[in-house]
Regions:
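Double-stranded beta-helix
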Residues: 5-8, 13-14, 20, 66-67, ...
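Extracellular/periplasmic catalytic domains that process cell-envelope and extracellular macromolecules
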Residues: 17-20, 39, 47, 70, ...
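Short acidic-glycine-tyrosine-enriched beta hairpin
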Residues: 19, 28-31, 57-89
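Short, conserved beta-strand element in jelly-roll/cupin
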Residues: 28-29, 41-61
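Short beta-strand His + acidic residue motifs that chelate non-heme Fe in jelly-roll/DSBH
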Residues: 37, 55-56, 86, 92-98
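Structural recognition of the beta-strand scaffold that forms the well-ordered cores
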Residues: 45-48, 55-56, 83-86, 103-108
Length: 121
């Protein structure tokens, strides 16, 4: 990843309006793990340390609709050593479809006291 001003979908980066806060999270997922459908209000740089991260995006569902079924309309796969800008404000489900543990890290560029994730109900 180099100097970027748009996310992987071409949406311009937007910085939080409140008090800035950077939260770094390291995840370790066993093979077969799958997150629930969710979205992040913020973006941030991410890196896959080992394994493979598969992300299915629903680019058509409204963020306001937290109860309806979601459908994958786009997929991205990131392998060990890949870095990318995590997508904000787009429903997605993330999984480890590989045969080894997935380890990845994300540094969320958010707002102090605000949630980093909204989960489908």
């Amino acid at each position: 990843m180099t100097d970027v001003s748009v996310d992987p979908f071409g949406t311009p980066l937007v910085y939080p309006e409140g008090e800035p806060s950077v939260t770094t999270i390291t995840n370790v997922w066993e093979p077969g793990f799958e997150s629930p459908w969710h979205y992040h209000p913020y973006s941030g740089p991410a890196v896959v340390i080992s394994g493979e991260l598969t992300v299915d995006f629903d680019t058509e569902s409204s963020l306001d609709n937290v109860t309806s079924e979601k459908t994958s309309t786009r997929q991205s796969v990131y392998k060990a050593g890949d870095s990318f800008l995590a997508i904000s404000n787009t429903w997605h489900v993330s999984s480890n479809q590989g045969s080894e543990d997935l380890v990845f890290m994300v540094s969320w560029l958010g707002e102090k006291g605000q949630p980093l994730v909204v989960v489908k109900q």
